[in-house]
Amino acid sequence: MKKFAETPFLPTEVEIEAISDNEAKISAYPFEDGFAITLAHPLRRLLLSSSVGCAPIAVKIEGASHEFDSLRGMLEDVAIFVINLKNIKFKINGDKEQVVVEYSFNGPRDIKGEDLINSEVDVVSKDAHLATINSDCNLTFSVILQKGIGYMPSEDIRDIVGADYIPIDAFFTPVKKVVYDIEKMLVEDNPNYEKAVFRVQTNGQISPVTAFKEAVSVMYSQMSVFNKVFDLSEVAVSDSGEEPVELKELVIRIDDLNLSARSFNSLDRAGLKYLGELVLMSEVEVKNIKNLGKKSYDEIAEKLESLGYPVENTLPENVASALRRKLEQLKA
């Protein structure tokens, strides 16, 4: 016998399937009829518009005064050099929002993306071509790299950087493609429930799972404006009292993460037992764990990234608060 519903059915399952390093399929279900597309469409928009990426915003080239100049011994005109630089995908190491990176190359040689890697930045597009110089050329330049969202034209950047820099159109978005499908599914003999299936592809600056988490976090943040009036902070996630799926993931024990003995022992000696404890820590706090070496830190950071919780990201406040309460209960 059917029952009268007082609230919409709440989805309970999330599945993540890695298709490649830069592509993933994320499914959530079951939604009541019409609810899947209601959430899927804005999430797609947010993924494409609000994911944080990194881009070169300006370059200063020794011997070049403007973008229409040319350099003796360099095959490319400065304009082509700037276009090539714009197409190289960088990652800033650490928490900095902006870095200025300096380079100097002697010819003859081809300069590619991989040649721009140093302690401050990594490069995703390692094979991307930047310039070809001959033996007469010493190419010296500095690049301003900035984290951001969306797009900023060079005209706006010109007012921000110094007059000796050539501004560059900044395409920050790390998400290359997002598509979603709404599939019908059967729940307790009712065929009118839905599954939202996303396919997310990034350029390698961030993982698809991280991009998806950021989009969900932005949606939470935008909706929080209503909390000023309606006090939604104590609204229950489900009438059954079940924990959110994300919270269940965050209370996985660290000894179930398949870390090396060295990394596990460092965390264990620090009293860390659950994944969520690491996720709540800042990058500096993780690095400062006693007896945690660089190799162990890199392993832990890679593990957190693969799980969709990179060390430089923060949880939505409602999830973080619920996680702290849960951890207190588990460690009591």
Curated annotation (Swiss-Prot):
Top-level division of the source organism's lineage: Bacteria
One term of GO molecular function: protein dimerization activity
Catalytic reactions on record: RNA(n) + a ribonucleoside 5'-triphosphate = RNA(n+1) + diphosphate
EC number(s) recorded for this UniProt protein: 2.7.7.6
Keyword annotations: DNA-directed RNA polymerase, Nucleotidyltransferase, Transcription, Transferase
Alpha N-terminal domain (alpha-NTD): region residues: 1-227
CDD domains reported in the protein's UniProt record: RNAP_alpha_NTD
GO BP of this protein: DNA-templated transcription
Region of interest called Alpha C-terminal domain (alpha-CTD), as start-end residue ranges on this chain: 248-332
One GO CC term on file: cytoplasm
The record's note on its domains: The N-terminal domain is essential for RNAP assembly and basal transcription, whereas the C-terminal domain is involved in interaction with transcriptional regulators and with upstream promoter elements.
Function: DNA-dependent RNA polymerase catalyzes the transcription of DNA into RNA using the four ribonucleoside triphosphates as substrates.
Family named by the database record: Belongs to the RNA polymerase alpha chain family.
HAMAP family: RNApol_bact_RpoA
Complexes and interactors: Homodimer. The RNAP catalytic core consists of 2 alpha, 1 beta, 1 beta' and 1 omega subunit. When a sigma factor is associated with the core the holoenzyme is formed, which can initiate transcription.
Name of the molecule in the record: DNA-directed RNA polymerase subunit alpha
Gene source species: Aliarcobacter butzleri (strain RM4018) (Arcobacter butzleri)
